Amino acid sequence: MKKHHLLLAVAAAFTLIQTAAGTVFAAAPPSVQDVSRMLRHSDGAVFPIGSYNARNVDHFTGDSYVAPLSKGPVPVANVTFVRGAHTHWHVHHGTSQTLLAVSGRGYYQIDGQPPRQLLPGQSVTIPAGARHWHGAAPGEMFQHIAVMEPVKGAWTQWFEAVDGQEFEALP
């Protein structure tokens, strides 16, 4: 229960992150109801799942959803990664990104470092300019709150997908 209150307090302190989440897929993405059912089997969903975001399908592997948590000067969102979905390698130029794990099991990796697991209640701040990726563990659901300070001139540069064999080899 303390984790729930802490996460609600953190979310209330920030606003929506306009994260680009999507995927290239052969079939329609799962419905919000289907994603809700899947999450109930992996610690449940504390925050809304939001809507499927196909705006940047070229920058994610697998399906993901984005839910705005508040409005204001600092963007904050809950991002739901469906069964192994994850971002491609990318860099946030001019601003850092903080990820707060909410449910399921995920990973992040900063280029040149080993992948690190993210579990509910854990957080990481990715430094500005650090090439990285983040998302669900192979075959598992994952949700995180993403927070980025809005900085004039900040932008995201996208790179290639994470190596599929290396990703699938994660424990």
Give the predicted meaning of each segment.
Residues 1-10:
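Bacterial N-terminal signal peptides that target proteins for export
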Residues 9-20:
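Bacterial N-terminal signal peptides
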Residues 25-75, 88, 155-171:
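A short, N-terminal "cap"/entry segment at the start of jelly-roll beta-barrel domains
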Residues 75-92:
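Conserved short histidine dyad/triad with adjacent acidic residue
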Residues 87-96, 130-136:
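Histidine-centered catalytic micro-motifs
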Residues 94-107, 111-112:
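Glycine- and acidic-residue-biased ligand/ion/polar-headgroup-sensing regions
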Residues 107, 128-155:
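Ligand-binding loop in jelly-roll beta-barrel domains
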Residues 112-129:
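Short acidic-glycine-tyrosine-enriched beta hairpin
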